[in-house]
Amino acid sequence: MSRISQIELDDRNLPPPTPEIEQERKVAIFDLIEENSFVLPKRDERDVPEGPYHLSLSIREKRLVFDVQTEGGDKAAEFHLSLSPFRQVVKDYYQICESYFTAVKTLPPSQIETIDMARRGIHNEGSRVLQERLEGKAEVDTDTARRLFTLICVLHFGG
């Protein structure tokens, strides 16, 4: 099974993330590197270099860019996804995360759990959208899609 062995976020033009967002990002990257599934399918009858891969995620000209290289530094693939299908779910996820971070500081556990369930539901929706958008470009499992979606949110909202 092919996988991502290294990930880089091109966040040079983003404001510094809040401590909560930075923590979410660190956890997503750590978990992604520890366990993921990332397969590049054959395209146009051409073989694709085998992984593991180094993945660079960035936003260029309002498009999400996946730049995939082999561990040896050779280009394996590059694909650009429109951000439009992600806009609403990213916005919803960002808002529920803000509510969650506030709730953790002030609300009882039962109310935090309710917000966390909603957060997980929106996160699942975002990972589903990502899997659909990657169809034919890369195959990822649900956990990998969830972690990548977290990183997309960081890039999309500028930290």
From Swiss-Prot:
It comes from the Bacteria. Keywords: Plasmid. Residues 1-21 are annotated as: Disordered. InterPro entries: UCP032146. Belongs to the UPF0262 family. This is UPF0262 protein TM1040_3562. It comes from Ruegeria sp. (strain TM1040) (Silicibacter sp.).
